A protein has these predicted regions:
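Short amphipathic alpha-helical recognition elements used for nucleic-acid or partner binding
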Residues: 310-341
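Conserved beta-alpha
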Residues: 1-306, 315
Length: 341
């Protein structure tokens, strides 16, 4: 389910109409099929535009096994080389239900970060970095720890992407015990044209919600929006109540918050909780709308919901209805309506 514009699998049985008329964008690679089916069961149209491809380096089972070993025998030092890699590690541990013992094992350790992004990810996880390499180089980090002395110390080294930078070997050479953890590697978007189209469409109001399942994916998608100079337009859609940004957990939400969004974050960091939160938002009267004599009116990308009933509308019909809604019952000239089209 990494391909193009749409619509993973239409065979999912519909169990509610809470998302009828909603077009939801998934800029995700991991478990997108599962998420698509869950949203379609509530009547949503789903589009896929993966911002990244995950290239497994060591699988989640291996990462979790090594993390369990750290919980059982906590490290003296934790080396965090990248913000995205550390976030990915925390997300994997959270999904495995091990977050609390994992953080408890890391908290007493000396935590060192290779630059401000790594420090930010450490802080978002509720931990504190004891030292940060201002040059953002592994060489500075290595020099600092070797000068402090690491003989006999148990060191957890989080790697990401391009490998170890020689850290494991340098620490082992002076008598440290190294637990090496490579989270996963990110490859480029499988279809950059679809990714570019998705950020432009978001700025033009074509989506009701965008769901993020990883911090690296969120960073990459927002980076694409920034590069195409459409990020302000996407922020405007959210501010107007026409776009819901949602993230599976606070780590994933980090890049969205940094960019100025106010994402919906479920209480539990699970895909099922994310889907339920989105269904509750649109199906429970929490989406932007107005009260009318005929009941509550809410706009969707595919039409309007009036008193809980979905009414399909053309784009022109939606544009006119949107202008009238914003007028709040005030009179509108024909010219003003035409200018909105």
């Amino acid at each position: 389910s990494t391909s193009g514009d749409t619509d993973a699998d239409h065979t999912a049985p519909v169990i509610s109409a809470a998302l009828a008329g909603c077009t939801i964008l998934l800029p995700v690679d991991r478990r997108s099929g599962e998420l698509t089916a869950a949203l379609q069961r509530h009547g949503a149209a789903v589009q896929l535009a993966p911002a990244l491809t995950i290239i497994p380096h060591i699988d989640d089972d291996e990462l979790i096994a090594r993390s369990r070993a750290l919980i059982a025998n906590p490290p003296d030092i934790v080396v965090v080389t990248t913000g995205v890699g550390f976030r990915g590690w925390v997300e994997t541990i959270d999904e495995a239900g091990l977050l609390e013992p994992f953080l408890a094992a890391l908290r007493p350790a000396q935590i060192v970060a290779r630059g401000p992004k790594a420090r930010g990810a450490i802080q978002q996880a509720g931990l504190a970095a004891d030292w940060v390499a201002e040059s953002e180089t592994a060489a500075e980090l290595q020099e600092f720890l070797l000068a402090e002395g690491v003989a006999g110390k148990r060191i957890a080294v989080q790697h990401h992407g391009s490998g170890s930078d020689g850290l494991d070997e340098a620490f082992e050479a002076v008598g440290a015990e190294v637990v090496s953890l490579t989270v996963y590697r990110w490859g480029p978007s499988p279809d950059p044209a679809v990714l570019r189209r998705s950020v432009r469409a978001a700025a033009e109001g074509e989506f009701d919600a965008i769901l993020f399942t990883s911090a690296p994916g969120a960073e990459k998608w927002l980076g694409s929006a920034e590069a195409l100079q459409v990020l302000p337009g996407i922020l405007e859609q959210e501010a107007a109540g026409r776009l819901l940004m949602a993230a599976v957990g606070p780590i994933t939400a980090g890049p969205l918050v940094d960019a100025g969004f106010t994402p919906l974050i479920p209480d539990r960091g699970r895909l099922g909780s994310l889907v339920r939160s989105v269904v509750t938002h649109f199906g429970g009267g929490h989406a932007h709308g107005v009260q009318t004599v005929a009941g509550r009116l809410e706009l969707r990308s595919g039409g309007a919901v009036l008193a809980g009933r979905f009414i399909p509308l053309s784009r022109t019909g939606l544009d006119i209805l949107s202008v009238l809604m914003h007028a709040g019952g005030g009179a509108m000239s024909r010219e003003a309506l035409l200018s909105a089209l």
